[in-house]
């Protein structure tokens, strides 16, 4: 009988990535298979997020539900990871006696060892340290699950915005070596991945060591990734305006693999609030970045993050945010009402904005962004869009689902052979959260760059050597 693993994940895309690595780690080294049913699992892992208010209480409520499962099965192992574990490790140990393992984002690679400690009788094994980039050296080889993949290029953040817990829960910025990233992406490309999304709390702060001891910038990394055979699209998230430098903007001008879509959080359009947030830039500097981006890449679309009701936010401050939204023409946003995070400088500021006022402002902002997004979508009517087909449609499995460069989901009638490839579709209808497409042509009719996968290169070398025609020279 196979051993079962259940993972519940809350929070950002980095957490989703970490959870997938936990599954790979325990699957390869200990033979666990994933299950959606917590009641049949031998190990339960909760990967937590501390960004939103009452994150800790949400964790304890979930652990209370899992405790009933452990009461029935004393051999059940329960682990808590992620940012709440980093922040509240001792509190979890004290309040939730059912928890066996507490680990941070940087120590998930030690899970097999921690599980063995529990099996030997140790109680509440805790490891929430920050051992820099060690975890990537201990993870199994990447495994593709479809034509798109996430690849972590760095961990942590050193910006210390006044509202944010990330530097305290994930540590300061640490970049992975260039060669490790390129190898992982090449392995994914060999498995059929066509699009990679480079992950980090602040990806444009990437400074990775190279094999010769020099440092690779984020702009240089983007060009290296674009040169990998099989990779035809590159996305990245998340970035910070103060390090969105001209060399990164230049990549948009000469690297077509980099999509015409950027998520660049601004949080507020008010200079006064940006200063209180310790963002390190003003609204005019953000607008300058977007202006230069649109000069380098015509038609690029921008999404952002907004915090509504930050302590001291006045009606004038909010008006500045709405003005910025109109000037930039954001296509999408992640917008939230401010919630104080314990241990951050902003938590000590007087929260003097009425909650009803916050809710009204949030509704106004989200309504404006939705209007702008629909306007962009309507402009796509009748155009031909190149999409990467990711799989069957969510609502109708007899149809296919793909994604445009500007991150819109398109559903269309097509053949299963198109999954994992690019197709051109004409946009024939527009909905709030998706588009409707009509199939025009498949990849075999496109003028795409000919990709030579590593296996083909090796086969060609072997054939040439056997024939004595050529000799491979690196």
From Swiss-Prot:
Gene Ontology CC terms: cytosol
NCBIfam families, sorted: miaB-methiolase, MiaB/RimO family radical SAM methylthiotransferase
Compartments where found: Cytoplasm
Cofactor note: Binds 2 [4Fe-4S] clusters. One cluster is coordinated with 3 cysteines and an exchangeable S-adenosyl-L-methionine.
EC code: 2.8.4.3
Annotated ranges, domain Radical SAM core: 143-375
Binding site for [4Fe-4S] cluster 2: 157, 161, 164
The protein, known as: tRNA-2-methylthio-N(6)-dimethylallyladenosine synthase
Residue numbers binding [4Fe-4S] cluster 1: 12, 49, 83
Gene name of this polypeptide: miaB
Limits of the TRAM domain: 378-441
Statement: the UniProt record of this protein carries the keyword 4Fe-4S: yes
Similarity-based family: Belongs to the methylthiotransferase family. MiaB subfamily.
Domain of life: Bacteria
Reaction(s) catalysed (UniProt annotation): N(6)-dimethylallyladenosine(37) in tRNA + (sulfur carrier)-SH + AH2 + 2 S-adenosyl-L-methionine = 2-methylsulfanyl-N(6)-dimethylallyladenosine(37) in tRNA + (sulfur carrier)-H + 5'-deoxyadenosine + L-methionine + A + S-adenosyl-L-homocysteine + 2 H(+)
Molecular function in Gene Ontology: 4 iron, 4 sulfur cluster binding; metal ion binding; N6-isopentenyladenosine methylthiotransferase activity
SUPFAM superfamilies assigned to the protein according to its UniProt record, in alphabetical order: Radical SAM enzymes
Keyword Iron-sulfur in annotation: yes
Domain annotation MTTase N-terminal: ranges: 3-120
Subunit comment: Monomer.
Pfam family, one: TRAM
Cofactor (UniProt): [4Fe-4S] cluster
Keywords attached to this entry: 4Fe-4S, Cytoplasm, Iron, Iron-sulfur, Metal-binding, S-adenosyl-L-methionine, Transferase, tRNA processing
Function field: Catalyzes the methylthiolation of N6-(dimethylallyl)adenosine (i(6)A), leading to the formation of 2-methylthio-N6-(dimethylallyl)adenosine (ms(2)i(6)A) at position 37 in tRNAs that read codons beginning with uridine.
């Amino acid at each position: 009988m196979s051993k079962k693993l259940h993972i519940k994940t809350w929070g950002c895309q980095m957490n989703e990535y970490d959870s997938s690595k936990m599954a790979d780690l325990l699957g390869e080294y200990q033979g666990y298979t994933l299950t959606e049913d917590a009641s049949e699992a031998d190990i339960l892992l909760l990967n937590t997020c501390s960004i939103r208010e009452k994150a800790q209480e949400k964790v304890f409520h979930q652990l209370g539900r899992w405790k009933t499962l452990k009461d029935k099965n004393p051999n059940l192992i329960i682990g808590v990871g992620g940012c709440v574990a980093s922040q509240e490790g001792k509190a979890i140990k004290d309040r939730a006696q059912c928890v066996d393992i507490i680990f941070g984002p940087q120590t998930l690679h030690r899970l097999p060892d921690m599980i063995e400690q529990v099996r030997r009788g140790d109680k509440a094994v805790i490891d929430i340290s920050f051992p820099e980039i060690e975890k990537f050296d201990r993870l199994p080889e990447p495994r593709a699950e479809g034509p798109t993949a996430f690849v972590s290029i760095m961990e942590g953040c050193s910006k210390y915005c006044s509202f944010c817990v990330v530097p305290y829960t994930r540590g300061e910025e640490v970049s992975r070596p260039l060669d490790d990233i390129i190898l992982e992406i090449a392995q994914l490309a060999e498995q059929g991945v066509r699009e990679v999304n480079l992950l980090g709390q602040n990806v444009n702060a990437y400074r990775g060591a190279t094999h010769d001891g020099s440092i690779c910038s984020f702009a240089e990394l983007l060009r290296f990734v674009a040169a990998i055979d099989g990779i035809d699209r590159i996305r990245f998230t998340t970035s910070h305006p103060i390090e969105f430098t001209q060399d990164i903007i230049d990549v948009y001008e000469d690297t077509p693999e980099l999509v015409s879509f950027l998520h660049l959080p601004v949080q507020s359009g008010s200079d006064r609030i940006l200063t209180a947030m310790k963002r390190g830039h003003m609204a005019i500097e953000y607008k300058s970045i977007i202006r230069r981006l649109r000069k380098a890449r015509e038609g690029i679309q921008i999404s952002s993050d907004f915090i509504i009701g930050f302590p001291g936010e006045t009606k004038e401050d909010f008006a500045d945010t709405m003005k910025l939204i109109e000037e930039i023409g954001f296509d999408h946003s992640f917008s939230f009402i401010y919630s104080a995070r314990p241990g951050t400088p902003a938590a000590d500021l007087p929260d003097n904005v009425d909650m009803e006022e916050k809710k009204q402002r949030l509704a106004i902002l989200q309504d404006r962004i939705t209007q702008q997004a629909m306007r962009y979508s309507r402009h796509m009517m009748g155009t031909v869009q190149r999409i990467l087909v990711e799989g069957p449609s969510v609502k109708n499995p007899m149809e296919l689902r793909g994604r445009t460069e500007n991150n819109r989901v398109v559903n269309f009638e097509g053949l299963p052979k198109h999954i994992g490839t690019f197709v051109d579709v004409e946009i024939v209808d527009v909905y709030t959260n998706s588009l409707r497409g009509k199939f025009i042509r498949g990849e075999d009719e496109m003028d795409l760059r000919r990709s030579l996968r590593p296996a083909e290169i090796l086969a060609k070398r072997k054939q040439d050597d056997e024939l004595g025609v050529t000799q491979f020279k690196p």
